[in-house]
Amino acid sequence: MTDLSRRSVLHRLAQGTAFISAGLPSLSALTSSLGAAPDHEAFWEMVRRQFPFREARVPMNAANLCPAPRVVAEAVVELTQDIDVDCSFNNRRKFTTMLELSRKQVADQLGVDSDEVALVRNTSEANNIINNGLPLQEGDEVLLWGQNHPTNNVAWQVRAARFHSSVKRVKTPTEPTRIDQLVEPFEAALGPRTKVLALTHVSNVSGERLPIRELCELAHRRNIHVHVDGAQTWGAFNLNLRELQCDSFAASSHKWFCGPKEVGLLYVKRSRIAEIWPNLVSPGWGSDVNPDVKGARKFESFGQRDDARLAAIATTVDFHRRLGFDRVEARIFELAGALKSGLKAEGFRLVTPEDPKLSGGVCIIQVPPEKRGEVLNRLYTRYGIAGSTAGGLRLCPHVYNTMAHIDRAIGAVREMRSMMGQA
C-alpha cells in the first residue's frame, strides 16, 4: 500500500468511517441488492465471505474465540504499520482521538455514556477490577452463580481468603423451563450481609441464560451491587446496559464481538465509579490520589497500550452496525435454534435449554467427560469443525456460519453417536 492510500485509510479510521476489504462488496451495497430481504441466505453467504477462514476448518466456538472480519484485521495491520513507520509522539497523537471514537462507538452500541466505558484487555481483567476494587469489609458477603467463569468465581474466593469476606454460590436448575426458576434461588440466598451479586449473562458451560434485569431489580431493592460477566452476549445480543440495569458489565472483544484480540470492555454505572478502586495506576492516572482521567477511564490506566487494536474497536462496531445489531442477534438465535432442533430430532440430549428466553448462542451436547477430547478432535480432523469440550461438546455458531455449516455439524455428530455415549 502506498503512503497516500495508507493516509487515506487512517483518515477514514480516525473519522469513524469503516471500510470493506478490496474486492469484497460492501455490506450496505449487499443489503441494497437484496432489497428488503437481508434475512435471505444469500446475504449471510456474503457475510461469511467477509471472514478469511477456510471451509475445511470452520470455527463454531464463538464462546471462546472468533475470527475477525477482514475489515477489522486489515485495520489493525494498517494502524500498527503506521506506528512502526513513525512512532513519534507527533504521529501517535491521533490515536487519542481514535481511542475516544472507539469508546463512543461502544457506548452508543450499549446505550450508555462514554464516561462509563473503560477499554481494558479482556473479560478476566474487567472481572478482577470489580473484584479487587469494590470496598468490601470483613464479613461482607458476595453471592455468585455457581456457573460463573473462574475470574468471576474463584477470584472472589481468593479475595475472601485475603480480606475475610465470604462467598456463597447459588445453584440453578439444570433443566429450567421458566424464568422464575432462575430468579427464586437467588432471592432465597440473599441475606443482610450480601453486598455483591456476581452473575453471568449466558453460561459458557451450560448455555443457560440468566434473567439479568429481574435479578438486578431484586438486588437493587437491597442496595446490592450487581456485576455481570457478559462475555457471551457482547456482539451476540443487541444489548442496552441501561435497560439491563446492572452496575457493572465485563466482556471481551475477541469473542462474539469479532474484534481485535486483547481488548476488553468494562462498563461501570456512573453512580458507582467513584467507589471502585483501580487495579493498576500508571502515568495516565495523574500525580495524586484523585485521577486526572474522567469517569471509567481510570480503570484503563495501564501505561503503553496497543493503540492499533484499540482504534480498530470502532471499525468492529461499524461492522456490526452495517449488519444491524438486531439482525446479528436474530441470526445467531436462528443458527443456534436450527442446531438445537436438529440435534434434538436426532435424539441427542442437550445441556442447553431450547427456549431462547433461557439461552443464547451457546449450544452444548451431553458427552461423558472421558470422551469429550476424542469427540472434539474427531469433529475437527474429520469434519472440519472447531468446537469445545466445555460442559460437553460445545458448538457456538455466529454470523460467519451458514446453514450448510449447521447441517455439517449435525451430520458429524450423528456419525459420532456411539463415540459420544448417546447410542
Feature roles, as predicted:
Residues 2-423:
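Pyridoxal 5′-phosphate
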